[in-house]
């Protein structure tokens, strides 16, 4: 006999529930204090409805607006699935009650996207709407509890979001048994997520508990909203999600039994979006509601999670009209030249050209022999010019070139033969002739000293024929012709005095002038100047330095003072700080073998002299980088007086005119004994620029005929061999500076405004207009 199984105890009956009835509106509980998230706060409340097979129709309304404290009107209370919405002012997410969790749609320009919770086993799709203040969305009207849906406008204040989730009240004949509940859990990034409170297992229409959630706008794209089948929620009533400003008092939000307003009215950051309750039925598998757009600006967008209806997207193609660009050949003349009736193949034998036409010009200059095109153009130019009297000579030449290119090789052959005959006759007539283009026509400078010095000369070297000092760095140096032992110091900072020995015998030797540039350099040979014995300053200005002063110089900055002749003397000139940067003028006497070189100190008295440090290869001031010769001296020079041939400016000295552009004349890496002298151009002497500004470019040293220079050694007074002298010259230079007498400006004006004498084959330096008596006094004092 089969044993009877013990029956399991029956489940406890559900607590009795009162039939649902309409409830009057009542005020809500005060919401907890909200936390601001980007000037907007969120308070979330969710509710869960009892799920019965026949009670799955719900209505949800999400209102996204800028609140002014007034809440939107609420629909009838009903059981519905909880939804947790996080929205921004331009996005609204519409969810069906039972569907899988829909991930938020990506939005590039949005900081947060809408997120939704899934509750029931429905496959309806959610809609994500991207709204703008000028967008109006009106879904078709549908009945809610038999009543028509009426759009409702809620004026709101900006910077406040109002989101409401409502559930319609269940009918009286619906089953009120409690089914499986689903909870909505916030993701791990929602730190202050939902706080759920439950007090019972039945859903009461009049009593409900609130679920409070606080959401942050940036955490919305990563918040996962999950629905659990095995989790039950106790007695959750109506759910309200509301946000408002933290510092604004909250107005009452009342839930009524009237029909829920369906539709969307968007005006001035105000959006109310609702779905009819029939849209969320259990048999509604796809949400396809038509939308009506009103007043959509070009910047407004509507973004759907699913495929949007095709009628919402209208693309218009803007026709691009191509603009014709008229291209005119540069070789074509501007005036239309008629060549129709002009014969262009006249043979040279028929033209009557002389054997060697125009071999010389008026000045007797031998011209080049004509080539084939010149022979052809000379024949046909008169006929073409006669047919086109309105065309000028340039236009005729352009047309002749075009017509010559149109000829075939056979048509050109007679002219090539004629050009060869002319060339042979020209060679017989002028056997040693070599073509040399005139620099004037090709805009080249002649090989003259004045044009060489008019550029930005950086290194001037005058040597004997056996010694050539190549360019190594930006320096200013002068080597006196015929010197075997010389002295050297740079113009770098300021020497106490510039002393130069004289050659033992005054003999003519070439002066090699280097014009360095980036591409190449070239020397220019110039006959040496014969200097007249005129001192630059009165005799009382001269005082010879003692040998102890010279030998007391530090080793790192010492100069080797060597005399080329036993009787040669050195003389220095002292000058005050006001005229410290004036030119150093040489005055040599070709009468006697001992020759004196008077010079001017280039250090201002106000300049502090640091102690000497033996740095053999360093710059007190770094020289500027080498560039084009026109840019080597972009800054104004620091000389108070500029020799006109040392003046900076956009002078161009072509390297092609200098025949010696290859080593050893080109610059490169050379020994370090070359003095570094460009520190003289540094900022320390800028303040002395304005002292003699009235004399700049005004003294008559540059206006010489025959393009000769008179005093090219006025800028720098040092030779090439010997250790370089740097700016720190110690106490020896201090004695030179302390004994400087004062010199008035008028004396210097007389010096530099002296009238120039008539130049001859030998260059002269006329520095002052002192007489012979002063010369004798100077020689006696020295």
UniProtKB/Swiss-Prot annotation:
It is found in: Nucleus; Cytoplasm. Residues 7-35, 97-106, 525-538 have a biased composition (Pro residues). Its main location: nucleus. SMART domains: HMG. The keyword Transcription regulation applies. Induction: Induced in germline stem cells by retinoic acid. Residues 1-37, 95-117, 139-226, 501-604, 704-724, 756-782 are annotated as: Disordered. PROSITE patterns: HMG_BOX_2. Keywords: Activator, Cytoplasm, DNA-binding, Nucleus, Repressor, Transcription, Transcription regulation. GO terms for molecular function: beta-catenin binding; DNA-binding transcription activator activity, RNA polymerase II-specific; DNA-binding transcription factor activity; DNA-binding transcription repressor activity, RNA polymerase II-specific; RNA polymerase II cis-regulatory region sequence-specific DNA binding. Residues 203-226, 704-718 have a biased composition (Basic and acidic residues). Residues 512-522, 555-574 have a biased composition (Polar residues). Pfam families: HMG_box (PF00505). Signal peptide: none annotated. Disruption phenotype: Knockout mice are viable, morphologically normal, but males are sterile. Male mice exhibit small testes and epididymis. Multinuclear syncytia present in the seminiferous tubules, with degenerated multi-chromocenter round spermatids and multinucleated giant cells in the epididymis lumen. Increased numbers of apoptotic cells in the testes and epididymis. Increased expression of CTNNB1, MYC, CCND1, and MMP7 in lung cells. Increase in diplotene spermatocytes in the testes, indicative of defects in the later stages of meiosis. CDD domains: HMG-box_SoxH_SOX30. Residues 366-434 bind DNA. InterPro entries: HMG_box_dom, HMG_box_dom_sf, SOX30_TF. It comes from the Eukaryota. Transmembrane segments: none annotated. One of its GO terms (biological process) is response to corticosteroid. The keyword Repressor applies. Interacts with CTNNB1, competitively inhibiting CTNNB1-TCF7L2/TCF4 interaction. Acts both as a transcriptional activator and a repressor. Binds to the DNA sequence 5'-ACAAT-3' and shows a preference for guanine residues surrounding this core motif. Binds to its own promoter and activates its own transcription. Required to activate the expression of postmeiotic genes involved in spermiogenesis. Binds to the promoter region of CTNNB1 and represses its transcription which leads to inhibition of Wnt signaling. Also inhibits Wnt signaling by binding to the CTNNB1 protein, preventing interaction of CTNNB1 with TCF7L2/TCF4. This is Transcription factor SOX-30. It comes from Mus musculus (Mouse). The gene is Sox30.
């Amino acid at each position: 006999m089969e044993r009877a199984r013990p029956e399991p105890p029956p489940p406890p009956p559900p607590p009795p529930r009162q039939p649902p009835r309409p409830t009057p509106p009542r005020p809500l509980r005060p919401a907890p204090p909200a936390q601001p998230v980007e000037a907007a706060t969120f308070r979330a409340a969710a509710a869960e409805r009892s799920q019965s097979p026949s009670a799955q129709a719900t209505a949800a309304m999400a209102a996204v607006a800028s609140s002014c404290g007034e809440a939107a009107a609420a629909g009838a209370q009903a059981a519905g699935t909880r939804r947790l919405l996080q929205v921004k002012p331009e996005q609204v997410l519409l969810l069906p009650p039972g569907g899988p969790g829909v991930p938020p749609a990506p939005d590039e320009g949005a900081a947060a996207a809408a997120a939704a919770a899934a509750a029931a086993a429905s496959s309806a799709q959610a809609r994500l709407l991207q709204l703008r203040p000028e967008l109006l969305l009106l879904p078709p009207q549908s009945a809610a509890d038999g009543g028509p849906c009426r759009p409702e406008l809620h004026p709101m204040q900006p910077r406040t979001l109002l989101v409401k989730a409502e559930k319609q009240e269940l009918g009286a004949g619906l089953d009120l048994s409690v089914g499986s509940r689903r909870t909505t859990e916030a993701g791990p990034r929602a730190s202050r997520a939902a706080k759920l409170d439950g007090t019972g297992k039945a859903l009461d229409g009049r009593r409900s508990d609130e679920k409070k959630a606080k959401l942050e706008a940036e955490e919305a794209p990563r918040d996962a909203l999950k629905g659990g089948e095995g989790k039950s929620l106790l007695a959750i009533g109506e759910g309200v999600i509301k946000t408002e400003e933290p510092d604004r008092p909250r107005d009452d939000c009342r839930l009524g039994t009237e029909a829920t307003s369906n539709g969307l009215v968007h005006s001035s950051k105000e959006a109310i979006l609702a779905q009819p309750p029939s849209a969320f039925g259990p048999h509604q598998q796809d949400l396809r509601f038509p939308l009506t757009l009103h007043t959509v600006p070009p910047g407004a967008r509507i973004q759907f999670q699913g495929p949007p209806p095709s009628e919402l997207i209208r693309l218009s193609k803007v026709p691009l009209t191509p603009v014709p660009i008229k291209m005119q050949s540069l070789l074509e003349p501007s005036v239309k030249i008629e060549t129709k009736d002009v014969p262009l193949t006249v043979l040279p034998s028929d033209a009557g050209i002389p054997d060697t036409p125009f071999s010389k010009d008026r000045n007797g200059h031998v011209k080049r022999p004509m080539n084939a095109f010149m022979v052809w153009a000379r024949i046909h130019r008169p006929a073409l010019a006669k047919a086109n009297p309105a065309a000028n000579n340039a236009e005729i030449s352009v047309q002749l070139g075009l017509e010559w290119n149109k000829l075939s090789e056979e048509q050109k052959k007679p002219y090539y033969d004629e050009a060869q005959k002319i060339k042979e006759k020209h060679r017989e007539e002028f056997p040693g002739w070599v073509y040399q283009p005139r620099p004037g026509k090709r805009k080249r400078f002649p090989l003259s000293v004045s044009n060489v010095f008019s550029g930005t000369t950086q290194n001037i070297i005058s040597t004997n024929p056996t010694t050539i000092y190549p360019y190594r760095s930006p320096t200013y140096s002068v080597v006196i012709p015929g010197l075997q032992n010389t002295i050297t110091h740079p113009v770098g900072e300021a020497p106490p005095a510039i002393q130069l020995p004289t050659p033992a015998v005054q003999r003519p030797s070439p002066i090699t002038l280097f014009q360095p540039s980036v591409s190449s350099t070239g020397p220019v040979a110039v006959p040496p100047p014969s200097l007249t014995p005129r001192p630059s300053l009165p005799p009382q200005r001269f005082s010879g330095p003692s040998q102890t002063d010279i030998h007391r110089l530090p080793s790192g900055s010492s100069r080797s003072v060597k005399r080329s002749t036993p009787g040669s003397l050195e003389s220095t000139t002292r000058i005050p700080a006001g005229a410290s940067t004036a030119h150093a003028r040489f005055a040599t006497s070709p009468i006697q073998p001992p020759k004196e070189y008077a010079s001017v100190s280039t250090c201002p008295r106000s300049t502090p002299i640091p102690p000497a440090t033996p740095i053999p290869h360093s710059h007190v001031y770094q020289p500027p980088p080498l560039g084009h010769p026109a840019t080597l001296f972009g800054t104004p020079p620091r000389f108070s007086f500029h020799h006109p041939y040392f003046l900076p400016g956009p002078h161009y000295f072509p390297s092609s005119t200098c025949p010696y552009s290859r080593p050893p004349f080109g610059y490169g890496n050379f020994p370090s004994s070359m003095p570094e002298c460009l520190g003289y151009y540094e900022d320390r002497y800028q303040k002395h620029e304005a002292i003699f500004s009235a004399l700049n470019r005004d003294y008559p040293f540059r206006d010489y005929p025959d393009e000769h220079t008179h005093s090219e050694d006025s800028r720098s007074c040092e030779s090439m061999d010997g250790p370089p002298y740097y700016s720190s010259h110690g106490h020896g230079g201090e004695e030179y500076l302390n004994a400087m007498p004062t010199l008035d400006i008028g004396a210097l004006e007389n010096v530099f405004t002296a009238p120039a004498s008539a130049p001859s084959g030998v260059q002269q330096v006329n520095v002052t207009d002192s007489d012979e008596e002063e010369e004798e006094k100077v020689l006696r004092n020295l």
